[in-house]
Amino acid sequence: MTGAGTPSQGKKNTTTHVKCRRCGEKSYHTKKKVCSSCGFGKSAKRRDYEWSSKTGDN
């Protein structure tokens, strides 16, 4: 029976996110080919949500 303890943490040594070509953040997923910050690879438009800014901010 394998657990999620200390021995399993040693397997987490692969690079998941690299620098994005569009926004420059370290959020581009190398396997999914999508940036979690700006949405590059998924959409031509920038990733933006209503909850990401305060109400009344323009």
Swiss-Prot record:
Entry GO CC: cytosolic large ribosomal subunit
KW Repressor (keyword) present: no
Positions annotated to bind Zn(2+): C20, C23, C35, C38
Entry keywords, A to Z: Metal-binding, Ribonucleoprotein, Ribosomal protein, RNA-binding, rRNA-binding, Zinc, Zinc-finger
Molecular functions (GO terms): rRNA binding; structural constituent of ribosome; zinc ion binding
Cofactor binding: number and manner: Binds 1 zinc ion per subunit.
Cofactor section: Zn(2+)
InterPro entries (alphabetical): Ribosomal_eL37 (IPR001569), Ribosomal_eL37/eL43 (IPR011331), Ribosomal_eL37_CS (IPR018267), Ribosomal_zn-bd (IPR011332)
Family assignment from sequence similarity: Belongs to the eukaryotic ribosomal protein eL37 family.
Protein name stated in the entry: Large ribosomal subunit protein eL37
Pfam family, one: Ribosomal_L37e
Keyword Lyase (UniProt): no
